[in-house]
């Protein structure tokens, strides 16, 4: 279900955005050139049950090797710009200028976070999402090197588990996310999970923010669940 915002996009503020997330809806744009936004509340919502997160043996080896350096909130703007750029199999983007401004605003008040994956000093991939209560809403991810976005997701899940999160919302489910254990839940079930997650508070800083977390550390947290 979607409803287009017919008012000026500038009327949507970071505070309005957070209240929308608390109601189970999120904004999108038709394309990068479309200044309007529309609200989305899928009949079937994508989530990754944190206790059922799956990491393949091959990916675990990559994560453990620390071929990439993983940081948090080091370059949020570069991550959202990477997510907005064309990717293989995806020529267009729903991240328009207003979306970018809104999520940078959420980042500035500590409600939106990025995970960066670096290779030889260059940004190889990453993801960003919104934190509210014990829920994390994954917005988008990208990669410029093989497995970079997958490594970002592994490190994100480790951080969420360490911080006491109970809900990882992926909005939709793709074959890529299914490989990590993503499932679809009906809207009413999702609302129940969201309401429960909003009753408490989690910490995105439960793992260090000032130094990279190693792959071995991240996998140890995941395998304890």
From Swiss-Prot:
Q: What is the originating organism of this protein?
A: Rhodopseudomonas palustris (strain ATCC BAA-98 / CGA009)
Entry's Gene Ontology BP terms? protein catabolic process
Record-listed E.C. numbers: 2.3.2.6
Principal EC category: transferase
Domain of life here?
Answer: Bacteria
GO-annotated cellular components: cytoplasm
- Keyword terms, alphabetized: Acyltransferase, Cytoplasm, Transferase
State the protein's purpose.
Answer: Functions in the N-end rule pathway of protein degradation where it conjugates Leu, Phe and, less efficiently, Met from aminoacyl-tRNAs to the N-termini of proteins containing an N-terminal arginine or lysine.
Q: Where in the cell is it found?
A: Cytoplasm
Instruction: Supply the name of the protein.
Output: Leucyl/phenylalanyl-tRNA--protein transferase
Highest classification ranks of the organism: Bacteria, Pseudomonadati, Pseudomonadota, Alphaproteobacteria, Hyphomicrobiales
Family the entry assigns:
Belongs to the L/F-transferase family.
**Family annotation (Pfam families):** Leu_Phe_trans
What are this entry's molecular-function GO terms?
leucyl-tRNA--protein transferase activity
Q: Which reaction does it catalyse?
A: N-terminal L-lysyl-[protein] + L-leucyl-tRNA(Leu) = N-terminal L-leucyl-L-lysyl-[protein] + tRNA(Leu) + H(+); N-terminal L-arginyl-[protein] + L-leucyl-tRNA(Leu) = N-terminal L-leucyl-L-arginyl-[protein] + tRNA(Leu) + H(+); L-phenylalanyl-tRNA(Phe) + an N-terminal L-alpha-aminoacyl-[protein] = an N-terminal L-phenylalanyl-L-alpha-aminoacyl-[protein] + tRNA(Phe)
> Principal place where this protein is found?
cytoplasm
What InterPro entries does the annotation carry? Acyl_CoA_acyltransferase, Leu/Phe-tRNA_Trfase, Leu/Phe-tRNA_Trfase_C
């Amino acid at each position: 279900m979607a409803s287009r915002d017919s008012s000026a996009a500038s009327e949507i503020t970071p505070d309005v955005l957070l209240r929308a997330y608390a109601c189970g809806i999120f904004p999108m744009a038709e394309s990068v050139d479309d200044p309007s936004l529309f609200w989305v509340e899928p009949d079937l919502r994508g989530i990754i049950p944190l206790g059922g997160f799956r990491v393949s043996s091959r990916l675990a080896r990559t994560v453990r090797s620390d071929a990439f350096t993983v940081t948090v909130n080091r370059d949020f703007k570069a991550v959202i710009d990477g997510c907005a750029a064309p990717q293989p199999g995806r020529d267009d983007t729903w991240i328009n200028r207003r979306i970018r401004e809104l999520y940078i605003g959420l980042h500035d008040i500590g409600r939106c976070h990025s995970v960066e994956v670096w290779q030889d000093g260059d940004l190889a991939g990453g993801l960003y999402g919104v934190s509210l209560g014990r829920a994390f809403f994954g917005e988008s991810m990208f990669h410029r090197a093989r497995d970079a976005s997958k490594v970002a997701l592994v490190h994100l899940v480790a951080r969420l588990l360490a911080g006491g999160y109970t809900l990882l919302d992926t909005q939709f489910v793709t074959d890529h996310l299914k490989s990590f254990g993503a499932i679809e839940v009906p809207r009413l079930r999702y609302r129940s999970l969201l309401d429960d997650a909003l009753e408490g508070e989690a910490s995105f800083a439960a793992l260090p923010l000032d130094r990279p977390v190693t792959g071995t550390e991240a996998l140890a947290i995941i395998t304890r669940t």
